[in-house]
Amino acid sequence: MRYEEFLESFLASDKSLKETIKKVSGLEGKMQKDSVKGDIKSLLKNLDALKNAVSSLEEALTGVEESVSSFDYRTYFTSGEFTEDMLLGLKERKMDTVGEYPVFEVFPTRIRIDGENQEVILGKKKVPTMRPKILVDSAADLVDKLESAPFNAQAFAQDLENAYLICVLQEKAKNTGKVNDHLFYVPLLSCYKVMVPLSRSRKEYDEMAFAFDLARLYNEIKKGDFVTKSGHTCLFGTGRGKSVRILDDTGMEQLISTICFR
């Protein structure tokens, strides 16, 4: 059973429960008024009606319980149906999604599905839901929040250039005379490791966060005339080292692996 099918069934049984509770509450109110007015005949009549309503309440509650127990949420997770519904929802929202179970990249964040414990982690936080629609909505809200956050392209470019220069010096030390100072490309992930040397710091600023900052810098450079505070231009390259996947300002995937400042 898919979650939306379960939800439809549950809401129908819950509606019956809600209506019965409303009836019970109404009869109790009438009985209170009857007692105040001294209308014992009406009080006894409403008391009998309340007994019947309470019996109906038990039946309605049983219906809700049966509806909930009919949904095997563990199987829903482990069978892959939850993942299928989530991916369909992301596609309908036109959200860029790559990866395979249990980890999916929804740039610039990730969704991890823990089938064993029936849990979902969006970014770095657990999302207490088993309804794919709510997860997709939460992912969309997080992406919007990240994309609307302020970004200082100059400050990031300067940090990146500083790391780049350290990598160039390290390369020179290993390969004396073989480094072209004018046009030398350094793997982006080498720069990342220089920028974030401690493993515990990489938990706070991981490669995904780095890729997102690269994407925003990439888009800033696309506008033209971007130079660093030191007066250098920034060039991205491909083909050397592990690629970093980013999305440009049109939503197109770009794979970049190296960088050069000149």
Located regions from the model:
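Long, compositionally biased intrinsically disordered regions
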Residues: M1-P150
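Short glycine-rich, low-complexity/disordered patches
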Residues: F71-E84, L88-R93, T97-F104, K172-V186, ...
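Short helix-coil junctions and helix-kink-helix linkers
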Residues: Y73-F77, K193-E204
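Alpha-helix initiation/capping motif
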Residues: R131-P132, N152, P187, D206
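Exposed alpha-helical structural elements
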Residues: S138-D141, A155, D159, A209
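Positively charged, polyanion-binding regions of nucleic-acid-associated proteins
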Residues: P150-R200
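Short amphipathic alpha-helical interaction segments
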Residues: R202-I221
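C-terminal engagement modules used by replication, chromatin/transcription, nuclear envelope/ESCRT
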Residues: R216-R262
